[in-house]
Amino acid sequence: KIAFILLCHKDPDGVIRQALSLAEGGDCVAVHFDGRAPDESYARIREGLSGVAGVTFAARRVRCGWGEWSLVEATLEAVKAARTAFPDATHFYMISGDCMAIKSAEYAHALLEREDADHIESFDFFESGWIKTGIREERLIYRHHFNERTRKALFYASLNVQRRLGLRRKVPAGLRIM
């Protein structure tokens, strides 16, 4: 049984449709709706999914910021809710509220039955070209105390101070950064 971990921040009606389509095949869904999103939108989702078997909600709505630890925290809240509500789940499948699955749940089940493996999407940090804009190696070798999006001046001032003082960290030997 797959427990879909649905992280979303907008479009309540789209979230409802997505959760219903994931749950109707017998799987389950744990929803985390961003704490920064309007309470009215969250209430709409709760109402729209009320009484639907196989749907649960994270106990706490985390205020999320792109690229921040808060996204990990929100994920963990949803996984905790899924583990509590659906103890028979054998796999956890994280999906964004902005994305609709391009493969069916049946496809995912067949793949999981066929292969005794966990599947985690990852990209080689240095070789993949996954990072399209902004800093690259600096993401690893310097410490980042400020959010680039919300405190841009402090972010770059901190980065420049570290560069001038030579406060580089080494990437641990033998690790392939994904």
Segments the model singles out, each with a brief description of its role:
Residues 1-178:
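ER/Golgi luminal nucleotide-sugar-dependent glycosyltransferases, focusing on the catalytic module
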